[in-house]
Regions:
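The feature marks non-catalytic terminal segments
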Residues: 1-5, 69, 76-77, 142-228
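Active-site metal-coordination segments of metallo-dependent hydrolases
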Residues: 62-65, 123, 166
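Histidine-centered beta-alpha loop that forms part of the nucleotide-sugar donor binding/catalytic region
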Residues: 17, 117-118, 150
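A short secondary-structure junction signal
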Residues: 93-94, 124-127, 157-160
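Active-site rim/loop-helix segments in enzyme catalytic domains that contact anionic ligands
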Residues: 1-108, 137-141, 226
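Alpha-helical elements of Rossmann-like donor-binding domains used by nucleotide-donor carbohydrate transfer enzymes
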Residues: 27-31, 69-72, 96, 100-103, ...
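Active-site adenylate/phosphate-handling loop in enzymes that bind or generate adenylated species
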Residues: 100-144
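Active-site environment of divalent metal-dependent phosphoester hydrolases
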Residues: 22, 49-52, 89, 118-125, ...
Length: 228
């Protein structure tokens, strides 16, 4: 797989703990894809192997299903897909995983990255955020970082900005429906309610919430402001 940028376009990375965590940022991803000047990379910390229970984890059937579903979602987005191979429910910011992610950042050199809120109540989310922070330090690649909201899992989330996804919301919900083994249609229904609520805050139909990491922001340079 080509891990570099296509045609000199700026790269944007989406660092997710599991397949289906694009539920927090797919509306933004589609907006970037529509502009045609960004190279999108989805980096999954785990394969979501335990998403159907222990038996489906042990026989590998859940992993296989979730890989296919994520491949379909990334194809819909036109995004490159990368795996870090941590284990769902038993993930850590291990040195080898941080080094693997650092090497990937060095190849991709993203302009911006979307990551999990570091104190999400789901441990896999917080571990992926910790690995991403260490990978930036190891690679010396420091993109603009924005944290996505995972609704009930993002405790004490403070939104610094809302991205209008009115033009991409229906495609986002169709993408979430691809996660059949995780009841993707139900995820889409939950996100629709949350994003209608956020949209009302800024006078649009649907919006996603993001928090900035100020330490990674260059003065006068903000990807999310540029696409408004």
């Amino acid at each position: 797989m080509n891990t570099g940028n296509d045609g000199g376009r700026e790269a944007v990375a989406f660092v997710c703990a599991h397949p289906d965590d694009l539920c927090g940022c797919a509306g933004l991803a589609f907006r970037l894809a529509d502009l045609g000047k960004y190279d999108l990379h989805v980096i999954d910390f785990t394969h979501g192997e335990r998403g159907l229970g222990e038996a489906a984890y042990l026989d590998g059937s859940c992993r296989a299903k979730r890989i296919k579903e994520e491949e379909a979602a990334c194809a819909m987005l036109g995004a490159h897909l990368h795996w870090l191979d941590e284990i769902d429910g038993d993930s850590y910011a291990r040195p080898e995983t941080c080094a693997k992610l650092a090497a990937l950042l060095s190849q991709i050199r993203p302009r911006a990255a979307i990551a999990h809120w570091p104190i999400d109540c789901h441990a896999d989310h917080s571990m992926s955020a910790a690995a991403f922070q260490r990978a930036m330090q190891l690679s010396r690649v420091f993109p603009e970082v924005y944290f996505m909201e995972q609704v009930h899992q993002s405790r004490h989330f403070h939104a610094d900005r809302y991205v209008d996804i009115t033009t991409t919301a229906e495609r986002k919900y169709a993408l979430l429906g691809l996660y059949v083994c995780q009841s993707g249609d139900q995820i889409a229904a939950e996100r629709r309610i949350a994003e209608m609520y956020h949209g009302r805050k800024i006078g649009v139909e649907f919006a996603e919430a993001y928090a900035d990491w100020p330490l990674t922001m260059a003065p006068g340079r903000c990807l999310l402001d540029e696409i408004i």
